[in-house]
A protein has these predicted regions:
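General helical secondary-structure elements
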Residues: 11-13, 66, 76, 86
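Short amphipathic alpha-helical interaction segments
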Residues: 63-80
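Short amphipathic alpha-helical interface segments
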Residues: 5-63
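A short, conserved structural fragment
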Residues: 79-89
Length: 96
């Protein structure tokens, strides 16, 4: 059994940003990078935007490290915009 079988996605940077924004909107308190990555992966699987993998079966519930880094970059950009605060891999919305 392969343990390191993460799933890649083929979303554009713009669509990825939209999904991360949706995830942030749904959060009431603090949230994590892992939560944002799981949200993006869920919608990629629902929308058919996962990259083809050997075996073609979903044998993982984890987003690929490269795509999770893309999610992290989006979150960091939103931090720089002043809309969320970061504490390591935890984030919190800043009140309007």
């Amino acid at each position: 059994m392969t343990q390191n079988n993460a799933i890649g996605i083929d979303y554009s940077d713009q669509r990825l940003r939209v999904l991360v924004e949706e995830y942030i909107t749904q959060q009431r308190g603090t949230f994590s990078l892992q939560g944002a990555c799981a949200y993006v992966l869920y919608w990629a699987m629902e929308d058919g935007h996962t990259l083809p993998a050997a075996g073609a079966l979903y044998q993982s519930d984890k987003l690929s490290p490269a795509d999770c880094q893309r999610v992290s970059a989006v979150l960091q950009k939103i931090v720089r915009e002043g809309r969320i605060a970061a504490d390591g891999e935890r984030f919190q919305k800043i009140a309007d």
